[in-house]
C-alpha cells in the first residue's frame, strides 16, 4: 500500500545561472525587500511631514551598516569558525585564486539579524543628528519596512537549507538534505521550518504596525516611538519562542544545537529588546498622561 507523506523541500539557492552571472534567491529576496521598503517608507514619511527624499538618502548607508553589523555580530559569536587554520579562505578574482580573511566572505553565509538591527540603528542615529530629524519619528517611519523585509528575507533561509528547527513529523515539515543537517540529527530527514514561522509572524506584525500607523494619523494622536516600541515587543516575543526550536543558535558559553551549559544569544537579546519596548511604552504613556494633566490644569 502506497502512502503519501507531505513535506516541503528547497529547490536550491540559485534563482538564475547565466554562467558569467549567478543570481541567488537570498540576494534577490533582499533586493525585493529594499525596493518595497523604499516605497512604503516614502509614503509613511510623507504622511508624517518628513521629506521622503531622506529615505532615499539614508538607504545606501543603511544597507551597508546593517550588513556590516549583521556580519560582525555573527563572526564575534562564532569566532571559532574563523580562527586558526580557518582564518583564510579561497576567493576567485577574475580567474585568479587568492586568499582572503574568511570573516569577509559573507557570501559563504553567516549573518545575524540582531547585529543588522544594531548597525542600522547606529546609522539612523547618525543620520538624524546630522540632518536634525526627530529620531523617534524617523525610526517609526522605517520600522514597518524593516519588519516586512525580515518577513521576506527569511525565505532566503528556505532556499539555503538553513535556520531550520528540530526534527518533526508535522504535515508542514521541511526535508533537509543530509549535508545540511546538524551532526546530532544526521539520521533525521524532516525538521521544523522555523524560517516560515518567523516569516509569518513578522508579516502579522507588519500588518498590525501599518494599521496602527494610519489610525494614529487619522486620529491626530501620533506618539513618536510608539510604533518602534510595538515592534520591539512583537518581534522579540516571536523570535524568543521560535529561537527555542532552532538547531543553529549563536551561543554564549555553550554549543549548538541546544547551547548546553550556555545561553542562546538571540533569546537573551529578545528579552532585552522586549523589556525595552515595554519600558518605552510606559514612558510614552506617562508623558501623555502628564501632558493631559497639564492641559486640563
Curated annotation (Swiss-Prot):
Gene it is expressed from: lgt
Keyword rRNA-binding included in the entry's annotation: no
Species name: Prochlorococcus marinus subsp. pastoris (strain CCMP1986 / NIES-2087 / MED4)
GO biological process per UniProt: lipoprotein biosynthetic process
Keywords, alphabetical: Cell inner membrane, Cell membrane, Membrane, Transferase, Transmembrane, Transmembrane helix
Recorded topology in the membrane: Multi-pass membrane protein
InterPro entries: Lgt
Enzyme Commission number(s): 2.5.1.145
Record family assignment: Belongs to the Lgt family.
Protein's pathway: Protein modification; lipoprotein biosynthesis (diacylglyceryl transfer)
Official protein name in the record: Phosphatidylglycerol--prolipoprotein diacylglyceryl transferase
Gene Ontology MF, one: phosphatidylglycerol-prolipoprotein diacylglyceryl transferase activity
Presence of keyword Membrane: yes
Role this protein plays: Catalyzes the transfer of the diacylglyceryl group from phosphatidylglycerol to the sulfhydryl group of the N-terminal cysteine of a prolipoprotein, the first step in the formation of mature lipoproteins.
